[in-house]
Amino acid sequence: MSLIMNAEQQYIDLFSQCEAMICRHSAEALNAPRATAFADFERQGFPTRKQEKYKYTDVSKFFEPDYGLNLNRLPIPVTPYEVFKCDVPNMSTSLFFVVNDAFYNQALPKSGLPEGVIFGSLRNMAEQHPELVKKYYGKLADTSKDAVTAFNTAFAQDGVLMYVPKNVIVDRPIQLVNILRADVNFMVNRRVLIILEEGAQARLLICDHAMDNVNFLATQVIEVFAEENSVFDLYELEETHTSTVRFSNLYVKQGANSNVLLNGMTLHNGTTRNTTEVTLAGEGAEINLCGMAIADKNQHVDNNTSIDHAVPNCTSNELFKYVLDDQSVGAFAGLVLVRPDAQHTSSQQTNRNLCATRDARMYTQPQLEIYADDVKCSHGATVGQLDENALFYMRARGIAEKEARLLLMFAFVNEVIDTIRLEALKDRLHLLVEKRFRGELNKCQGCSICK
């Protein structure tokens, strides 16, 4: 039997043996699609590089080692509210934690959220608001089309529910900190369900942190429903470690005249594969999809995106930038689909990449599929090195070569940082990126919570 088959078989056997336990420690709404998801995973198997969608990241090999799972939901001995120090000072947020893949319910502070807003354990909220969760959970994350999503849906037992009622504006940003902490090599399967009803507005910052003395594998599925006239910002900041592998699938559906900003920033990692699928389902919807990756050593960052212009009069703006050093590898594949009836579409996709060494590798694959004739669509991708003329100019004016290189790299990614609509976060990212380029930011330094 091949290693790949062994990897699949161990989880097939595990689910078959532990399905009752998995369901017992979850909620009915999460259990409802579980059997179908498992069957979809069993049929598809782990993705390999032979599949076009996963050609730049061999997902299957990362599931071959043995990982521990907390299917019995044993409590983790950690008190995040006592030891966590936010990496973004001067930003007042409503702060919540997920420890491994369980929402931390103990010692919750007063969140200060407006009346009717829900932010809490997906498992608990599915028991308190079953009809709400059943209506949305799993409706965007199609397990028949993606094996990682199927795997996550089969094994996920908890996560986060964020619900903002009609016309409610959440002025204070919400911050969710994902913590990976264990004594053995460990796997987590996280789930996030986000619902903004008509006219609602909110901003969410998700921060990923991990301890560095064990190997982690994390799967994550996020579903976002942005209804008519809603406004939503989602920022993801990854500061984990070289021993962390993360597969994150983000699904977004937007209603008419909704405005969504997605910005995923990888400052430090091991292996990261992000899949983002956006459907513009209502006229006048606008998506701004941005990403930034800074990688060195043998780090690997792969972003695969698709934006589906399903109706007329929608706008999409996409901007991804990578800076790769040493033997790091980056990949970007972005599809923009304009359907036959989606006239008056405006779409712009840009991918710019900087390889600081000859050993760094960047793969880029921009794609446009246009089936309407009255549209404005463009895309562009470049892979290059630092501008030698600019370096010469700066050195001629007394700037040391190392400092000149740092300044050029910082200026290169600054465009992505400037899309952030939270000033405190934007200011902090400028500092964190500068420290990263100087080699002063090797991983999360916000607290001792993962130690």
Indicate where each model-derived feature is located.
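Short, low-to-moderate order helix/coil transition modules at the start of elongated helical scaffolds
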Residues: 2-221, 228-231
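Conserved beta-strand/loop scaffold segments within soluble protein domains that form the structured core
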Residues: 115-119, 128-392, 396-399, 413, ...
